[in-house]
Every structure is written in C-alpha cells, then in structure tokens.
Amino acid sequence: MEPIRFTPRQTLLAALLAATFCTPAMASKAVSWEDILNDDKTTGDVLSYGLGMKAQRYSPLTRINTKNVDHLVPAWSFSFGGEKQRGQEGQALVHDGVIYITSSYSRIFAIDARSGKRLWEYEARLPEDIRPCCDVVNRGPAIYGDKIFFGTLDASIVALNKDTGKVVWKKKFGDHKIGYTMTGAPFVVKDQKSGKMLLVHGSSGDEFGVVGWLFARDPDTGEEVWARPLVEGHMGRLNGKESVTTGDAKAPSWPRDKDGKLVDAWNHGGGAPWQTASFDVDNNTVVIGAGNPAPWNTWHRTKEGDDPRNWDSLFTSGQAYVDASSGELKGFYQHTPNDAWDFSGNNSVVLFEYKDPKSGKLIKASAHADRNGFFFVTDREKLAKGAGYPNKPTSLIGAWPFVDGITWASGFDLKTGKPIEKGNRPPAPKAGADKGDTVYVSPPFLGGTNWMPMSYSQQTELFYIPANHWAMDYWTEKLTYKAGSAYLGQGFRIKRLYDDHVGTLRALDPKTGKIVWEHKEKFPLWAGTMTTAGGLLFTGTSDGYVKAFDARNGKELWKFQTGSGVVSVPITWEMDGEQFVGIQSGYGGAVPLWGGDMAELTKQVTQGGSMWVFKLPKSLKN
C-alpha cells in the first residue's frame, strides 16, 4: 500500500489557497456546554458529532415524517469546488443559521443555512508527505464558545473563529512523516469533577505502525490536558507530566523476545482511536473505539510457537472507557483479541438504556456494531467503575452476528466475554517462503460495517446498521518495520459474498439480536444513518442517492440522486418553522482504494464534492 501523495501543482495550490476566504458575517452567539449537553433534545441546531453525547443520531423532529417525506425537494446545494474532491465523509454542524462542514484535503466551510452562500472557507497547508491510509477524508468539526475545531491530515488540530474563519490556534500532536494523521471529528465534553471544558480527539495511523493516542485539550488555548496511549504498558501524560501507564506497565498481553525485551511490534502497536467519542456524563467517562493492533500479522504479536489466543494485544480492537479528569483508562472490552484481520473497533460506541426483559431492571448499556461482524451490548456501568485491571471481558451482555457468513468466530462465550474462534487465522509463511497459505475470510478487513455510524431510534428501540456482505482472500507476508511505510504483513483481495448485493441496511433489536428488517443495495454502503421522531431513517448510497425509509418496516419512501456517491452522515434541524435534512455527496473513502472487486464495481461512480439540503415545499411545511 502506498500513501497518498500530492503533485507539485497540488502543493502550490494548497499554499495559495490556505489563507481563509471570508465574507464578513454577523457574529453569532457563543455555544455553551449546556447547549452541547442538550443537543439531543434541541431541534434548532446540531452541535455535536452523533447528535448528542450518547451518539444515538436520533432527532425529536416530526415535521418531516412517513406521510410527507416523499415530497422532499432540494433547498440548495453547495459545491466544495476546486480540483480536490475524493471522499466526503463529514457530518455537518448547524448553529444560529450557519452550517459548518469539513471536506476532503482538510478543508472547512461556513455556509449560510438559508441560502447556501459561502461565508468563509479555510484550507490547511498540507505537506506532500502526509500518509493517510484510506483517502484524504475528514469526518467533521466540533464547536464550543466562539470557536470551531477540526483535525488535519498532517497530524494537527486547528481552532478557528466560528464567525470569521481566522485561525485562533493550531497544535501538532504527531509526526505525519511516520504515519500520524487525523480524520475523525473532535468532541467537546465537560469534566464533571473540575468543571473544565475539554476538546477530545484521537490520532490515526495504525496501518503505518504508530501507537494510537487519545488527547484532551483546553479548547481556549489548545494546550494538552491529558494524553492516553492505547497500547498496554505505554506511559500517559497529565498536565504535561508522565502520569500512569495504560494497563500493566509490564504489558503482559504482548510477548517478549528471547532477550527479555518486548517484541518490536509493541513499539508500533496501533490501537488508534481515530473515530469520535461519546460521553457518559453520569460517570464522567469518555467512551471511544480503539483501532487495530499493528501490524495486522498476528504472528508478530504472538510468542514464537505459541497460540495467538494467549496474547490479546491490549488495548486494541475494542471499546475504551477513559476518565475525563485524569485520562486514565478505567475500563475496556475487547471485541477481537489479538486481532489478525484488521477488524479494528473504531466505529461508534452508542450509549443507550433499556429494560431487561426478564427482570424489568433498567440497564445502562453501550452498543457497538463491529467490523468483525458482531453486534455487542456491554454494561457501561461496569466498564466505567475503574476498579482493578482495565480489561473487563465479563462486562459483555450480548454479542450477535449482524451480517451473514462470518468465518472467524461462531459466537462469544458470555461467561468469559471471549470469542469462540473457528481456526480462521492466516498461517505464517513456511520456511523459505515469502508468504503464507491463503485463507478465505468473511467479513474482510473492510468489515461487516466500518467507520460509518449506526443510529438508534427511541421510538422503535432498534439500531440501524449500514452493513456490507463481502469476503477476502487473505495471506501473511514477511515484514520489517520501516518508518513511514505500510506496516501490515498481510496480503488480501476483496471478493463478493453474494451476486445480488453488497450493501445491507439492517434494523436490529439490541435486547435479542434479532434482525427485524433489511434493505439490500448493489453497491457497498459507506454512509451513516440517522433516525427521527417522524418515524424515519435517513442514509445515503454509493451510487449517489439520499434515501428515507420507514424505520419500523424498512420500506423505502423517498430517494434523490445527488450526482456522486454518498458516503457521509445525514443531519436534520429546524429553522424558520421548517425542518431541513442535510448531507454531503462525493464518492471516495477506503473502498475504491483498497476494495479489490468492489473497487472495480464502483468505478462507474463519478467523483463529486457538495453539500445538499432538503426541505418540504412551502405548501406542505405544516
């Protein structure tokens, strides 16, 4: 795998355009913590990634509903312009009549929500030697006070004045030359103990062999408050000083060489929390998915001659529970111990409550649809307690397959919290060979689902998962770490699982694991979902449609062709007595870069880069 590189012309253009383009705008009111905390309840704005602290992506709006959604029409469309298109995976924010949206190549725009007019634009000056593994995407900004925040592909995070787009501060958190980058949206929380506001964000770069970090900063200055590595035995920081190691300082879940030192893979161990967190306010806990271990090759993280199942490669490919005050890892549930398939664990961890069908007790839970093909429900109270060793496999409540044809495991043991493996790990190369024997794996490393966030409906009490059916041929390869180069030790070829579809949108009951309904798509699904109190589910498709479904039964009620693949996340808000739905269009992401047969399938999808906003005609608004 080669990193994406810039041509000299692209670099010159970036230098010329990096200055902010600005149309003077009226100063809007500052965003408070109370505004952000109530984002899931208020309807006139969208102030957080996930539409609330719990990341449920559920809106209480009802003006657009199952009875009238088929009348939706475009209000306006905004082009991101220039030659830079690629994948548009962002989720927009809305505040005081202004939309804030990021786009490919580390750009951010402020747009008048009523007219679609650009108010200002900022484009980061990106060096030629950035190393994003999976396209030059950006998944969105955060907002607080008078500032808007977003990450850039050169491993930096930037704060801009939300009214002018002028840079307030910029902080670099890693060396982009060796693989550190940032694609996820930052997240604003309030430490419930100290009262301090925190800007929380992760790093990316597992595929280049870097240790993943989760950071918390002062949103006013950008100064680091704490930093937490997600590889066991690595040291964290608090207020600029060393704090405590992550887990056991001896890192017993990683093997040692004959010289007694930890294996080299431990130095490059991955675990990057590159997606966006949710926040358990009651427990003052940042909840986030941890990325895959590095390298992918399981044998580099296993003691020679031993069983990989004895070496978990903590704290990777799971869900992490971090104390907002100290940055210490309180709890962890690992979806894929000693992950050999790049199943990662980054996609959203959604916080929700339900009544236990047997006892009637209210359960405070977390839900996660993993790339490994299983849907997990965990006890977030147990995971946030912070007692003893952080790894808490017995926090598992349920684990059910949400896609077909899973080859690596038959299920999970609820007593131990561990997977019941089926012997699907690719063997190491034999003596004298450059690669190992090929195994057939489903889902492939692109996952049963991937980064695209699922949603939860408080009406139906179902989760809505943008999933895919596919597989891969998979084999180990010889590997030596080289800074700035891909650090995988695996070869692969993505293949079809079924002839009639790849994408499958599925509604799942988290109390039973039952698939209530599904909708199939020819192309891979790579967009997130959103539900509303109007009984609707919104998402996008790789062949260019924005679609609305009846959340109860999966009936397709409306669609609109945007002209390019939709691989972003929908939002909704109300303004001037009308409800609006917004989403980005612009095909890209990991599938066309890494997708094998899937990349060939989607060649016909045209490039693009735009923001679309929809509403009901005036005659139907009431």
Model segments located where?
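Extracytoplasmic beta-rich repeat domains
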Residues: F78-L93, E121-A142, K170-V188, F208, ...
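N-terminal cofactor/phosphate-binding cores enriched in small/glycine residues
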Residues: A55-G174, T532
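Blade-level signature of beta-propeller repeat domains, shared across WD40, Kelch, NHL, RCC1
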Residues: I571-N622
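Beta-propeller blade signature
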Residues: L160-N161, G165, G212-E224, D306-S326, ...
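Blade/loop signatures of beta-propeller domains
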Residues: K29-P74, V244, G423-K430, I494-K495, ...
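Repeat-solenoid scaffold signature
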Residues: G184-G222, A340-T416, P429-V441, L446-N450, ...
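Repeat-blade elements of multi-bladed beta-propeller folds
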Residues: V46-G50, Q85-R107, P132-S156, T181-E207, ...
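Loop/turn-rich, solvent-exposed surfaces of beta-rich toroidal or solenoidal domains
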Residues: A467-H469, L497-K555
